[in-house]
Amino acid sequence: MKKAFIIGAGPAGLTAAGDLAKLGYKVTVYEALHVAGGVLMYGIPEFRLPKAIVQQEIDGLKKMGVDFECNMVIGKVLTIDELMGEYGYEAVFVGSGAGLPRFMGIPGESLKGVYSANEFLTRSNLMKAYLPTSKTPIRTGRKVAVVGGGNVAMDAARSALRLGAETVYIVYRRGMAELPARKEEVEHAEEEGIIFKTLCNPVEILPDEDGFVKAITCIEMELGEPDASGRRRPIEKKGSEFTMDVDTVIMSLGTSPNPLIRSTTPGLETNKHGCIVTEGDEGKTSREGVYAGGDAITGAATVIKAMGAGKAAAKAIDEYIQNK
């Protein structure tokens, strides 16, 4: 039986694993975290995607013969070269996602009560630590500021409400028309009472005497000419700073791929954003037998795009192995 392995048990990796298993391959999925599912399990809130549904899909793959190795950080525990050499795998699909959060680099980001959206959503989804007997509580305050305007920001804001926050703000440097989140996500957030503080940007997070967040200072913005993304560039209004009392700040400013795989795989081409470079839609990389897809090549995107990439790559991997 021909063997292939998958790095990452998120939507791209799970889709590729299922398609390869159907084609008769022995597939092993290596997952860095202790539960398979990736963003489906850790990132998307329970009220949007029940975890029992994700587990059903994973259990279905196991019945098809797919093996899952969790707590396996490829690039640290094992490398791609080792797996394709000593372990005898003929091809790999890299679906390791883009889980490295970005921060603003402003004063106060290291205070207690400041989270990345990734950490906040992971904690709120799991509500426990790696060891079943240990808890990793999430401290949600009464007043929460979520910085950013994408779908993940909406998820974080709505999760904070469900965890008991009295007031939740979305702080975004452009206007409502420029919000990158889907229209439906914005409407849901508005319906639930989340307050949108648009055309303003944080400049500092202020501490109390114990090192916890007590407030956030923002500056008003105005929109200038369009930038490279086609959206109008936000420009600071001098002297317009104001302070909001908050006790939790969640940074939802996008993510990038973890550098572990690219730094331990010689000859694997990446771009300036750290994303793996591929040819066409099939996910073929600069390394023979190495395919990639999902957020690992695009940066943070949608689940459906990641699944499509996994499907296309599985087909390409099959063609590659059959023609070897």
Language-model-detected regions and their locations in the chain:
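Long hydrophobic segments that form regular secondary structure
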Residues: 138-174, 242-248, 255, 274, ...
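A conserved FAD-binding loop/helix module that cradles the flavin
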Residues: 296-324
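A conserved short coil-to-beta-strand element within the FAD-binding core of flavoproteins
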Residues: 70-84, 199-211, 221-224
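FAD-binding core/adjacent interface of flavoenzyme oxidoreductases
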Residues: 1-7, 23, 51-54, 66-143, ...
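FAD-site-proximal beta/loop scaffold in flavoenzymes
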Residues: 110-141, 226-300
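Active-site loop ensemble at the mouth of alpha/beta enzyme cores that anchors a bound cofactor
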Residues: 108, 200, 214-222, 238
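Beta1-alpha1 glycine-rich phosphate/pyrophosphate-binding loop at the start
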Residues: 5-74, 102-109, 119, 153-205, ...
